[in-house]
Each structure stands twice: as C-alpha cells, then as structure tokens.
Amino acid sequence: MKGIIFDMDGVLVDSMPSHVRAWQLSVKEFTNINVERKFVYRNEGRRSRELVKEILANYQGNSVDTLIIEKIVKRKSEIFKKNGSFKVFPGVIEIISNLECKKAVVSGSTKEDVLNIINQNFGNNFFDTIVTGDDITDGKPDPLPFRKALQELNLKANQVLVVENAPLGVQASKNAGIDCIVTLNNTPLSYEDFKLVIPKEKIFEDMKSANKFLLNWCN
C-alpha cells in the first residue's frame, strides 16, 4: 500500500489569498508592519505563532513580544473565519477520489480551521488522517508534521508522496525523507522560489496537470 499526503491551503482549497489578507490586517493592527504577499507564501506551512515570530524578526529585527504574538494570532483567526467558505480547486475531489491509496492532509493551520474546511468540502471520512498545526510542536520545515502523518498512516517514507505548494513544505518533506511534487495553482511564487529544493519536472501548474503523475504513483 502507498499513500499521498496533501497540504491543504493552496493545494486542495483556494484559501491562501484569505490567509494572506488576514495576516496583513492582523499584523498591521498591532504593529506598523506592512507584510508583503510573497512573504506569507514563502513562509506558508509554519505554525501560526512561528509565522508571527518570523514576520516580527524579518521586518523589525527586535525582541519578540509574546503578548503581541498571541494578540496577532487571535485576531488573524477572527478575520480569517469571517471569510466563510472556500472553493476547492477544479478537479481536486474527483482526482483524489480516483487514487487507490491512503490519503492524508498535513497543514500548519489550526485544527479548527482545517477541520472546518475539510468537513465542509470533503466530508469527515474523505482522508485517512489529518495532521494540523495544533497536533505538533514544530511546524514546517521541520519534518515532524510529515513523520506524524507517516505514523498514523502506518507507512514508511519511501511509500509516500507529498503534494505541496510552498518551499517550506517541500523542505519539510525532504527532511522527512519523503518524495514531493508541487502544484502551483494561483500562488505568486514561481520555479525560482523552488529551484533550491525541488527539480523543475516535479512542479505542476495545478492538480489537473499532476493527475497522471499521481495515478502512476498510486499504481
């Protein structure tokens, strides 16, 4: 038996623009920082608190205020929830349904956000296991999220493929010893942002263009 692990935001559902806007608004509310869109995409996969620390360190370079971090994380979650539902990328449900292997989701987002989106769009039995940012102590690029998924799938690293859309996710899969492909979808990132972590032939425009690769992998 083989397995495929999917990132959620930007791979399965078109939720990244809402994440980006929520981070921009919440950070601006408590600091004078204007967070660039690409910065969020490049750091996608980090757990929420780790991402805020990265933002403060990158833009201010000063000591991290734990209280401010908690306020930003809470406010970001509030703003994100106001966006309501998110559309699944075209073909995703059909493509995954046709894969005859184990399927998992690994996301740096909170358990509440992940389960709400998955249950709303896929149902609660569509994936064999789901690992969220609340389930682990270290987020991507640390291999822990993927190693936890391997454990829950009862599979070895060489039996699994990861589908990502962010450089940190690709790095995390490599650190876990798992092969990986990228589906860009509507990310502002390009091959230049991935060239240090993954070969060009493993980068696809979207899930539809990766369909044949995924089917061959499962077979």
Label each residue range with its predicted role:
Residues 56-94:
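Metal-dependent phosphoesterase signature
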Residues 18, 43-47, 87-91, 109-110, ...:
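Short beta->alpha linker loops
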Residues 26-27, 47-64, 117, 150:
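Helix-loop "lid/cap" segments that line or gate small-molecule binding pockets
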Residues 1-2, 110-111, 115-219:
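Asp-based, Mg2+/Mn2+-dependent phosphohydrolase catalytic module
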Residues 20, 24, 45-53, 73, ...:
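An amphipathic alpha-helix signature
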Residues 12, 88, 103, 162-163:
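Conserved SAM-binding loop
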Residues 81-105, 111, 115:
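Short, acidic loop-to-helix structural element flanking the phosphoryl-transfer center
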Residues 1-39, 175:
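Active-site neighborhood of HAD-like aspartate-dependent phosphohydrolases
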